[in-house]
Amino acid sequence: MESQQLSNYSPISHGSACASVTSKEVHTNQDPLDVSASKTEECEKASTKANSQQTTTPASSAVPENPHHASPQPASVPPPQNGPYPQQCMMTQNQANPSGWSFYGHPSMIPYTPYQMSPMYFPPGPQSQFPQYPSSVGTPLSTPSPESGNTFTDSSSADSDMTSTKKYVRPPPMLTSPNDFPNWVKTYIKFLQNSNLGGIIPTVNGKPVRQITDDELTFLYNTFQIFAPSQFLPTWVKDILSVDYTDIMKILSKSIEKMQSDTQEANDIVTLANLQYNGSTPADAFETKVTNIIDRLNNNGIHINNKVACQLIMRGLSGEYKFLRYTRHRHLNMTVAELFLDIHAIYEEQQGSRNSKPNYRRNLSDEKNDSRSYTNTTKPKVIARNPQKTNNSKSKTARAHNVSTSNNSPSTDNDSISKSTTEPIQLNNKHDLHLGQELTESTVNHTNHSDDELPGHLLLDSGASRTLIRSAHHIHSASSNPDINVVDAQKRNIPINAIGDLQFHFQDNTKTSIKVLHTPNIAYDLLSLNELAAVDITACFTKNVLERSDGTVLAPIVQYGDFYWVSKRYLLPSNISVPTINNVHTSESTRKYPYPFIHRMLAHANAQTIRYSLKNNTITYFNESDVDWSSAIDYQCPDCLIGKSTKHRHIKGSRLKYQNSYEPFQYLHTDIFGPVHNLPKSAPSYFISFTDETTKFRWVYPLHDRREDSILDVFTTILAFIKNQFQASVLVIQMDRGSEYTNRTLHKFLEKNGITPCYTTTADSRAHGVAERLNRTLLDDCRTQLQCSGLPNHLWFSAIEFSTIVRNSLASPKSKKSASQHAGLAGLDISTLLPFGQPVIVNDHNPNSKIHPRGIPGYALHPSRNSYGYIIYLPSLKKTVDTTNYVILQGKESRLDQFNYDALTFDEDLNRLTASYHSFIASNEIQESNDLNIESDHDFQSDIELHPEQPRNVLSKAVSPTDSTPPSTHTEDSKPISEINLRAPREVDPNISESNILPSKKRSSTPQISNIESTGSGGMHKLNVPLLAPMSQSNTHESSHASKSKDFRHSDSYSNNETNHTNVPISSTGGTNNKTVPQISDQETEKRIIHRSPSIDASPPENNSSHNIVPIKTPTTVSEQNTEESIIADLPLPDPPPEPPTELSDSFKELPPINSRQTNSSLGGIGDSNAYTTINSKKRSLEDNETEIKVSRDTWNTKNMRSLEPPRSKKRIHLIAAVKAVKSIKPIRTTLRYDEAITYNKDIKEKEKYIEAYHKEVNQLLKMKTWDTDRYYDRKEIDPKRVINSMFIFNKKRDGTHKARFVARGDIQHPDTYDTGMQSNTVHHYALMTSLSLALDNNYYITQLDISSAYLYADIKEELYIRPPPHLGMNDKLIRLKKSHYGLKQSGANWYETIKSYLIKQCGMEEVRGWSCVFKNSQVTICLFVDDMILFSKDLNANKKIITTLKKQYDTKIINLGESDNEIQYDILGLEIKYQRGKYMKLGMENSLTEKIPKLNVPLNPKGRKLSAPGQPGLYIDQDELEIDEDEYKEKVHEMQKLIGLASYVGYKFRFDLLYYINTLAQHILFPSRQVLDMTYELIQFMWDTRDKQLIWHKNKPTEPDNKLVAISDASYGNQPYYKSQIGNIYLLNGKVIGGKSTKASLTCTSTTEAEIHAISESVPLLNNLSHLVQELNKKPITKGLLTDSKSTISIIISNNEEKFRNRFFGTKAMRLRDEVSGNHLHVCYIETKKNIADVMTKPLPIKTFKLLTNKWIH
C-alpha cells in the first residue's frame, strides 16, 4: 500500500511535493487524511531518516514484523544520513533505572545494540519522572492489522498478543528546535503507536478511540517532557501548557489537525498544478473541480489570483482546447470565469459536431491526456515509467505506428477500441502522444505532433503548391505509387505514397474536393491555398474564415502559434487502408545507432546519401541495418537548419489571389533603373517605371537623379494622371526597399494621400518580379533598338519609351488582351508608327536664307506624348524635335541597311502602312504653320544639344576594323541627296562628340581606316591624303603593343606623294561633289590630321636633337650661357646609354579613347613616350560604351559565406575624374585604447609599463595644472556643448618606451567652443629638407630637442570641461580646463602662438616670411614641429644658448646635441638620418618600414625574387563597374586607405621615385577592384624590397659661390582618364633632391607642348618660394633654373612674337609663364628625355630606364 511521506513535506516545499506526487490507493472505510492510521508508516520512515548515525536492517528493525506493513528497504540501500535530529536517546536495559520504573513492565523488550548508543545520551537521574506503566497491563502492544477495519487496536487486542516475540520500541528523537516540532510530533505519534497506545491518539474529529487511563496519561506526560524540552516548544504549544501543563492530548489533537490541514493544502496545490483537460469529461464537472480547489485554498489562507489560476488551467488544456493557450495568453486581465466560458463553448461545439455527424465522431479516448492507464483485452501496452513501478499507460511513438485496419463504423465505442490489436511501443518522452490515445483517425499520422502543431487541424500554407496529409483516413479514390516529385523548402525530395481526393463538407452543406498527396514524412498536414483557390475558395485572414468569392463563409480559421489552421472535422473520412510506412520502435531499436548520431558523425550529410553509401559499402564497420532509421525522415538537425539555410522559394502566382480584389489602377508596381554612365548632363541617367497590377498598363518617366524631390515629383504626376484620366485612386504601391522609396519625404506623401506602401521582404527580390521583369524587358528592347538603329547611347530613354508604347498595345497570352484594352484605351495605330531610328527628312521651317536647303536629315524615335507629331532626332542640330513635317528617307545608304535590311525593311511595305496617315496629314496641312515643328517643351530629349562645329566638308565614316571587310560603296543607282549646310542655333553640350551623335556601323573603339569613301555633290573624287590609321584596341596588352609597333614600322604608309594624288571620296550628308583636294605635304598632314592646329614654333623635333644637354642658344652673353651650363653640371643626371632609342615627335603620342573598357589611368600609362598612334580628326573621337545599359549583376560568389543570404551589391564606378592628387589619406592607427593597453592586455610586462606610463601622464597633468583641482562640477550644471569627452591613448615608440596620453575628443568639439580662424602651424617638409641641405653644405651642427607636454604650457581662453581620468572614479563629475589640453581644436594654435612669442621675444629669433615654424637669427635656424625642435648653426654654443633660454620656461629635453664629428643618427619627424658633418647625409626609413609593413597584412614575398620596379608599362586598370557588397567594399576601401596612406607618407618624405604610382593608385581608393589591390600590393612589395634605399646627399663643392635651385619638369600627355595629362616636378638644391610632386593636370591639354607648359607653370610658384627661403637662411646668391625636355615649350617661353599666342587658347598660360620666367630671372634649359629624372613622376617606365633615372640620387 503506497503512502506519501509526510516527514518530507513542509509548507515551503510545494514544488517538490508536486513533482513527487504519485497515485495512491485508499481503503474506502478509511479517511485519507487520517494521520493515526495511514501516516504511521511514514512517521516511522521519518524517524528512521532522522537518525543520522543509525541504519535500519531487517534484523534490527524497530517496526514489528507485520505482513501488512511496507516492505523494508533492501540491504543494498545505504542507511539514512544526517537526519533532522542530531542525537538519539535510546533507552536500553543496561541503564540503571530508578526503582519502580519499567518500560510498560517489559524493560527487556529493548535489546542493547552498540550502534544505538549516542555520545549525547546521559542516564536520567533518580529525580526524573519516568513513565510508569499501569499494573493491569503487563503485555507488550502489537501493531494492528489493516484487515481489522480499525486503525488502532484496543486493550483486548493488545492482550491477545502478549505472547508475541519481544521487540524493542525505538523512542522518538529529542526536539531541538521549534521549527522541527511538526516532524517531531509525527515520530512521537509513531512511538505511541508502536507502544500499543494508538487508541489514545485523537482521530480526525479530535476524539480518541478509547478513554485514556491515568497511568497512560502519566506516561504520555513524562515522555513528552523528556523528549520535548520546553525551550524548544512552539509558542502555541506553550500557550496550551500554560493553561494546563498536563493537557498533552490537546497538543496532539491540534498537531493532527494542523497536519491534516497542511496535507489537504498540499494535495490541492498538486492537483491544481497537474490539471489535465481534453474534453473527455463535461466542462461543468471540470469547472466545479477547479473552483472548489481554488476556494478551499483561499479559505486556508493560500490566495490564488486569476492570473496564476488561468495559467495553471491553460497549461493543462490539450486537444482542441490547446489553442486557448495562445489566444488567451496575451490577455493580462483575464479571469477564470472568462476562460471557462471559452472552454464551455468549445465543449458544446464538440458535442454538437458529434451529434450532427455520427460517422465522424472522434473516440472520447483520443484526447484523454490525463488518463494514466489503458486496458487492452488482447495485448496491453506496458510502458515502464519508473524502474520500481510499472504503468499501463498507453503512449504514442515519436515517428512511427503500426496502423491497424479501421472498419470506420458509424459509431466507435469502447468495445471496438478494446478489440484493436497493436504492438507494444516505447514512450520516448512525455511530449510524444497523448496518454490513453487510441489508434483511430487521429493516430494514423506517422509523425509526432510538433510542439507548435494544433492536433486535429490542417495547416494553411500559401507557399505550398500541393496539399499533403499524413493520414490515409481521409483520402478518397487513392492510387498508390504516383510518379510525382515533391520537394520541401530545403529542396529535399519528399517521397509520396499515394494520391487521391480530399473531400470537404462545409458549414453551408456544400461538398468540395481537391487533390491530396499522402506521405508520412512531413511535420504538419498541409492544406494548399493555391489548390483551394482553384475551386473558388479563399482564405480571409481579416475575418479568419474560409469563404467563396461570393462571400459565403465555409469554415472558421483558427490562429494557433504563428500559423493558421482549419479543423479536420470538415473532412469526409474514407474506407482506404494504407499500409504501414514506418516501423514501430521496438526494443531492438535501442541497440541500434540513432540516426542523429550518425548524421552528425558523417558531416551532417542527408539520410539518403548515408543510406546509399552504406548499401554500397563505401562506409565500413557497420551496415545499414545497424542504424535506427525510424527518425531519419522527419529528423530536423538544428545545426543544418542554421548552416544550410536558404531563401524561401518564391511560389509563382502566390500573391494573385490577394490582389484580385483590386480594381484597375488601384495596385501599382514601381522600380527604378540606373544609372547609365558616360552620358551628357542633359540626358537622363535613370528611369522609373510603373505597372498596374490589374491591367498591366505601363508608364515610364525619365530621371536625372534619385533625389527625394525628383522621385516625389514623379509620384505626384502619375497619381494625378490616374485620378484625372481613369477616375481611379491608387490604394497600394509595391516597391523595393531602396532609399529612394523608404525616405521620410515619400513616406509622408503616401501617408497623406492614403496610399499603403508595400515593400518587398528581405532577400526576396522575386516578390518584386513585376517591376523588375518590366525593366529587364525594356532594357533588352533598348539595347536592341540602339544596336539596330546605330543611334548614340544618349538616346537610350527614347528607345525605352518607344518600347513602352509598343508593349502596352501587345496582347498578353494569359489575358488575351493588351494592357491598353484592359485600361479602356484605343489600340496602337501602326500607320502612325515608324521603326525606331528610321531615317527621315524634317522640314526646316525657319532656314537661314531663302536659298538654304529646307530639309534636315533626322532619325525617328517615338510618337510624341504631347501632340500628334513624332519625336525626331536631328544630329546636325544636336537636338530632338516634335513635328509632323517629315518624309521617310528610303535610300539604300541609310543606317538601317548595315544589317542587310533589304530582307528586313521594305520601302513599299512602309509606304503602304503609312499611306493613310500621310494622306491625312497632307489633307490637313497648313502651309505656313510652324506650330507642329516647334520643339516640345515637355520632351526631355529636346534639351540635348551638342557642340557647334564649323562647316566641314569631310565627315569621317567609320569602317570595319578588319582589313578583310571591304568598305561599302554607293552604286550609280543610288539616289543623290543634296548637300545640306547646317547651323547650330544654340550652344551645345560639351560632353557629346561627333561619334556619339551620328550612327556608326560598328561600335569599335578606334577603327582602322584602310580607305575612305564618300559621296560628294558632284560625283566621286578621291583624295590622296596620307592618313595615319589609328590602331584597333586589342583585347590583350601584347596584341595592342604589337599592333602599334607594326603600324608604326610601315613608314611608307605615312610618306607623302608630292606628284601623284588620288581622289578620296569624302563622306557627306547628302549629294555628290566633284572636288579635288590639293596636294598636302607631310607637314601639312601632321598639322591637319594630327594636331589640327598650326605649330607655334618651327623648332626641330626632339628626335633630331643631340643626346647631350644643350641649352637653347639665345642672344645672351657668354656668362649667361656659362650659368646655364653650370646649372646642369652638378645635377644627379644619368649617364646616356651608348645607343639611345630613336624618339619621335610628341605629336605622335597616342590619345586613348575616353570610354575605353580599359582606362588609361594605369600603372602602364598609355601616354608612354614609346607608344605612338595618330588620329584622323580635329576633334577626338569618343568611343561609345558598349555596356552602358548593362544592368545584369554578377552571380553571387558562393565562396563568400560571411552572410547567410546573398549580399545586396552596389555598383561602384570610377571617381578618379575629380581626384587630382593624394588628399585626406586616412592614417594608420598605431595607438591603443585603455582597454587594449591595460584592461584586456594579456602581456603582463607590457601592461605594467603602460600602467606606469598612465600614472606618469596623470602626474604630469597635475603638475602642469591642466585643470582646476579645487572644484568638481556636476554634469547637470554645465552646458553640454562645453563638455568635451576625454580618453587615454597608449603608444609604444620606436625606441621602446611606452607612452600614455590623456586627450580630449576634439573631433566632436562644438564649433562655438573655439576660434575657427586660428591655425595650428608646423614646419613644411620642403623647409626641413632645405634646412638639412644647407646644413650639409655649410657644416652646420644639428641639434634635436623635445619639449615635454608642450600644449599644456598654453593657456586656454574658452570655458571648457572634460571628464576626469578613469582612476578617480568620478564618472558623473566634470573638471574645468585651464590649459590647452591635447586633442582640442585650439590647442595647436594656442601652443604655436605661445612658443612663437617666446622665441621672438626671449630668444631673439624671427620667423621667415611665408614659411611658418621656421625661425632664424644671425647664427641659428630653428624648425619647429609641434613639440620637436631642430636647431641648425655653425657654432654649437649658439645652439646651447638657445637651449638654456628654453629651459627657463619649458621642460626641454635634448634628444641629440649633434656635437660629434663622426656619423650621427637622427630620427627627425619619421626620417632616419645619418649625418657626418662636412661629408654626406643619408635619409631613409628602413627601421620604420621594417616595423610597419608587416603589420599591413600584405602578402609579402620576403624570400622570393625582389621587384626591380614598382610597376611596368602596359598595365591598364580595368574600368568595369565594380559590384560588391557593402561590408566587403568598406573593408577593401579601409585596406586601400592604410596601404596608400603609408606609401604616401613614405613617398613625400623621401621616396620621390614612387610618387607617380602612389598618385595613380590613390585615385582608385574608392574603387578597390582586385586589379587595383594587386597593383597596390605590388607597390608595397617594392617598398619592402627596397626599404633599405636612402636619399643620398653629398656636400657641395666649396668652390661654388652661389646656391643653385633647380626644378626639373615633365608631362605625359593624355595618359590619364578623360585626356588629362600627368605632370611631375623634382626640386634640387645644390644638386640634392629635396622634393618632388606628381599630380594630374587640372586642365585638359590639347597637345604635348601645352602639357609641358602646364607642368612648368605648376613648378614656378614653389620654386620662387624656395628661393626666398634659401636666401633667408643663407645669404649666398642664388641661381634658379627650369629644366624641361620640350624644346617647343622653351621656344614659346623665350619667343618675343606675341602673334602666336592670339589664336591659341593656352596662350594666356604661356604668356603668364613667360612673364614669370622673365620677372624672376629663371633660366630655362633643355634636358634630354633620357636624362630627365622627372620622367619617373609622369609615367611607368621599363626597369632599365627606371633604374637609370634614379640610381644617381636614391640607392
From Swiss-Prot:
Region spans: Integrase-type zinc finger-like: 583-640
Positions with biased composition (Polar residues): 1-23, 48-60, 127-152, 1005-1015, 1053-1082, 1101-1111
Post-translational modification as stated in the protein's UniProt record: Initially, virus-like particles (VLPs) are composed of the structural unprocessed proteins Gag and Gag-Pol, and also contain the host initiator methionine tRNA (tRNA(i)-Met) which serves as a primer for minus-strand DNA synthesis, and a dimer of genomic Ty RNA. Processing of the polyproteins occurs within the particle and proceeds by an ordered pathway, called maturation. First, the protease (PR) is released by autocatalytic cleavage of the Gag-Pol polyprotein yielding capsid protein p45 and a Pol-p154 precursor protein.
Site (described: Cleavage): 401-402, 582-583, 1217-1218
Active site: 461
Modified residues (Phosphoserine): 416
Any GO MF annotation of the entry: RNA-directed DNA polymerase activity
Residue ranges constituting the Integrase catalytic domain according to the UniProt record: 660-829
The keyword GTP-binding belongs to this UniProt entry's keyword annotation: no
Positions with a binding annotation for Mg(2+) 3: 1610, 1652, 1685
Cell location: Cytoplasm; Nucleus
Region (RNA-binding): 299-401
Region named Disordered: 1-93, 126-173, 352-421, 956-1087, 1092-1111, 1129-1172
Catalytic activity: DNA(n) + a 2'-deoxyribonucleoside 5'-triphosphate = DNA(n+1) + diphosphate; Endonucleolytic cleavage to 5'-phosphomonoester
A biological-process GO annotation: viral translational frameshifting
Residues holding Mg(2+) 2: 1346, 1427-1428
Compositionally biased residues, Low complexity: 153-165, 402-418, 960-969
Keywords associated with the record: Aspartyl protease, ATP-binding, Cytoplasm, DNA integration, DNA recombination, DNA-binding, DNA-directed DNA polymerase, Endonuclease, Hydrolase, Magnesium, Metal-binding, Multifunctional enzyme, Nuclease, Nucleotide-binding, Nucleotidyltransferase, Nucleus, Phosphoprotein, Protease, RNA-binding, RNA-directed DNA polymerase, Transferase, Transposable element, Transposition, Viral release from host cell, Virion maturation, Zinc, Zinc-finger
Location (main, coarse): cytoplasm
GO cellular component: cytoplasm; nucleus
Pfam families, per the entry: rve (PF00665), RVT_2 (PF07727), TYA (PF01021)
Subunit text: The capsid protein forms a homotrimer, from which the VLPs are assembled. The protease is a homodimer, whose active site consists of two apposed aspartic acid residues.
Biological role stated in the UniProt entry: Capsid protein (CA) is the structural component of the virus-like particle (VLP), forming the shell that encapsulates the retrotransposons dimeric RNA genome. The particles are assembled from trimer-clustered units and there are holes in the capsid shells that allow for the diffusion of macromolecules. CA also has nucleocapsid-like chaperone activity, promoting primer tRNA(i)-Met annealing to the multipartite primer-binding site (PBS), dimerization of Ty1 RNA and initiation of reverse transcription. The aspartyl protease (PR) mediates the proteolytic cleavages of the Gag and Gag-Pol polyproteins after assembly of the VLP.
Protein name: Transposon Ty1-PR3 Gag-Pol polyprotein
Protein's organism: Saccharomyces cerevisiae (strain ATCC 204508 / S288c)
